[in-house]
């Protein structure tokens, strides 16, 4: 088992470049199945375990996939298999994103019920509701969900009960090859939705309105391979914004898109953090003293749930009482107990977490409970006394490329070690980046 060991006390300074967006690339790779003619070439693809997983799903479905030098080339022109098995889907719930493309291409899709981070129930009922509205029949049982259509999918007017990102992406992809026009209302507005729509349109689809609450998809007969560059990862950018703020540092985050970070920027400026938009990206300068604020997670353009745990780490250092309310996912406070192990004054009240600060955090051995919690615990370790050891790094590797190396390059005392060499002396660890 691997661990990240971090020693607190260093101000982080320098420049870091964010990767292509994990939450954009996964549905885009899945949507590449829609192209029955030609190859799709995707650039700015992050080297993440989730990307390898979705690539394996596509290979199982009989697509040819090559991943090298941050570029994925996909040829899905052969006849596709219809089933994504549990061995892949259990690792990552984004595997369910192949369902819409398979249904549109083959008229049938059979997907194991999804896995991924253990964040509440995260049902896929909105995905299935959309498929049914387009004429598909859906059956759920024996650990699988199966959808099939006699003939072809038909355009429909679909209203989502909640602006689900995954459902918006899956329905939008399926509708590209449906007969007629699909109007998707109360659609998710995230930048990743816009990126997927741009890719679909590059393949020959007719998608309009992505990024608004109403998306209109006019079905076409066929889609073709295309070239597409993945947008930068706004959550990775936000995570490094917190790294600068929490350590009182000064970091230029290259490749960050300011327009994608408005809600994060607003809250951090409210806390006293200085944020400067530059040509290369976003520069973040941490203050000597952070102010307490309240945050409520919301669908875009509200504050992103994927930044909740990182902001929690930051608010533990703020002067006064802060509250975070989680409205998007249930059961996304499992990291609170790990913060308590670090001597944090923090408690859960319903769907909210209340923090009193600033906290003098103590290094401890803590376990990552999900992807973003892994990053948050490392961020907390940057300002803790002594050594923090973070385990369950499989979560971290799903969403961050070389996170510890990027932090080390900014001045953090941090190393990733295998348990076999865990007996390394603390002094040796502290000297790693002296």
From Swiss-Prot:
Domain of life according to the entry: Bacteria
Record localization: Cytoplasm
Major subcellular site: cytoplasm
Sites where the protein binds UDP-N-acetyl-alpha-D-glucosamine: 93, 122-126, 306, 328
A GO CC annotation given for this chain: cytoplasm
NCBIfam families linked to this entry: murA (TIGR01072), PRK09369.1 (NF006873), PRK12830.1 (NF009470)
Name of the protein this chain belongs to: UDP-N-acetylglucosamine 1-carboxyvinyltransferase 1
Native source species: Bacillus anthracis
Species lineage: Bacteria, Bacillati, Bacillota, Bacilli, Bacillales
């Amino acid at each position: 088992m691997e661990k990240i060991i971090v020693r607190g006390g260093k101000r982080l300074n320098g420049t870091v470049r964010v990767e292509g967006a994990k939450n954009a690339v996964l549905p885009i790779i899945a949507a590449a199945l829609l192209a029955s003619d030609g190859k799709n070439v995707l650039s700015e693809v992050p080297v993440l375990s989730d990307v390898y997983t979705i690539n394996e799903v596509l290979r199982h479905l009989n697509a040819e996939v090559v991943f090298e030098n941050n570029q994925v080339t996909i040829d899905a022109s052969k006849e596709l298999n219809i089933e994504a098995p549990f061995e892949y889907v259990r690792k990552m719930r984004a595997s369910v994103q192949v369902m819409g493309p398979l249904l549109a291409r083959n008229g049938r899709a059979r997907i194991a019920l999804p896995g991924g981070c253990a964040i509440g129930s995260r049902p896929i009922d909105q995905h299935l509701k959309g498929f049914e509205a387009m004429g598909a029949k859906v059956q759920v049982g024996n650990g699988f969900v199966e959808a099939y259509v006699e003939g072809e999918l038909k355009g429909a007017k679909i209203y989502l009960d909640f602006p689900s990102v995954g459902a918006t992406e899956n329905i939008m992809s399926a509708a590209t090859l449906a007969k007629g026009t699909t109007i998707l209302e109360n659609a998710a507005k995230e930048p990743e939705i816009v990126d997927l729509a741009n890719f679909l349109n590059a393949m020959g689809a007719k998608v309009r309105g992505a990024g608004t609450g109403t998306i209109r998809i006019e079905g076409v007969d066929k889609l073709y391979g295309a070239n597409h560059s993945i947008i930068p990862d706004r959550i990775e950018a936000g995570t490094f914004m917190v790294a600068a703020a929490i350590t009182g540092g000064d970091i230029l985050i290259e490749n960050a898109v300011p327009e994608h970070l408005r809600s994060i920027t607003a809250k951090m400026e409210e806390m006293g953090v200085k944020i400067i938009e530059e040509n290369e990206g976003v520069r973040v300068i941490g203050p000597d003293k952070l102010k307490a604020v309240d945050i409520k997670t919301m669908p875009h353009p509200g504050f992103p749930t994927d930044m909740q745990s990182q902001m929690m780490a930051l608010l533990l250092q703020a002067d006064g009482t802060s509250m975070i309310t989680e409205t998007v996912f249930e059961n996304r406070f499992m990291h609170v107990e790990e913060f308590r192990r670090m001597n944090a004054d923090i408690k859960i009240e319903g769907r909210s977490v209340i923090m009193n600060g600033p906290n003098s955090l103590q290094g401890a051995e803590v376990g990552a409970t999900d992807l973003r919690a892994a990053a948050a615990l490392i961020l907390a370790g940057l300002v803790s006394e002594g050594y923090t050891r973070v385990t369950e790094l499989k979560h971290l590797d799903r969403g961050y490329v070389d996170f510890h190396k990027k932090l080390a390059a900014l001045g953090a005392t941090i190393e990733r070690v295998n348990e076999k060499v865990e007996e390394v002396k603390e002094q040796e660890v502290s000297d790693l980046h002296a």
